[in-house]
């Protein structure tokens, strides 16, 4: 890097900060923060626990946004001042140090941009994920299992926690179906872009002739909704079945019918839960998942109406990403149109860059 390149970088980063400022409007946020702090001083607020919690979440969200913005703004201003002073004093050592720190400065401002992309209505919520294999029997079930492992490894990398709601093992390999909650900061904001059809091309380990196979699996990501969000579900639209736990994920096999399967007849959405020994808790968890899925379905319907996007079956529906392991190794996201060569690392959970690239593409 030379002086010209660094000067251009500072200009570019200043433009990014200005764009973020135009989006978040710090003065308006500071005014709202002052209003919240005044409201918190009113004893009447704490009588309504739900409202108090809602106000508290809003305060935390605004405070975090303002803190990140101020930090990035200060870092950029400091870098600019140090650089101008170093140039005027012909201080090569300081200039070279600033050059070395430039990547970190760029990364911090990129993180600020990303946090703005994760400021949607439900982005701060936990994510409920369902993975279901497409046609192809063992091939599809194994691919669904590979995707589940990918998300588990991603969560381990970034510090998210997972709660399994329902886990149905495949007959020979992989999984028939899995529902789980990902808990952590902006879990839904990051993982919402994973909803869609994932396609795998590889030499099948289940084919003695060593032929190439294509497999599909669907991923549905929905936000874990707060209890105060009302989703109207008519009891007559539900079919509720109780059955014995199958020992999901190596857990206990229950001798009572504590596992719950709920079918929403109008949409044919089926949710299951068997993670608890208590039938009532499993039913409550299943209803939470159903509520989340119906909320997401309604949102998708509105998007499809505005985009006029037709919907198809799992094999040929809305593919979002291709994973090719043979004859070459490549993962390509069909929305950002970016190809990645580290297929094995990606399947081992290294997907943060892919998620961020899609989020950035969706904003452009």
UniProtKB/Swiss-Prot annotation:
Q: Where are the N5-methylglutamine residues found in this chain?
A: 251
A Pfam family annotated for this UniProt entry: PCRF
> What's the PTM story here?
Methylated by PrmC. Methylation increases the termination efficiency of RF2.
Q: Which Gene3D superfamilies match?
A: 3.30.160.20, 3.30.70.1660, Release factor
Task: Cite the SMART domains for this sequence.
Answer: PCRF (SM00937)
Q: List UniProt keywords, sorted A-Z.
A: Cytoplasm, Methylation, Protein biosynthesis
Q: Which domain of life is it from?
A: Bacteria
One of the entry's Gene Ontology molecular-function terms is: translation release factor activity, codon specific
Return the similarity comment.
Belongs to the prokaryotic/mitochondrial release factor family.
Protein name, as recorded: Peptide chain release factor 2
Source organism: Campylobacter hominis (strain ATCC BAA-381 / DSM 21671 / CCUG 45161 / LMG 19568 / NCTC 13146 / CH001A)
**Gene it is expressed from:** prfB
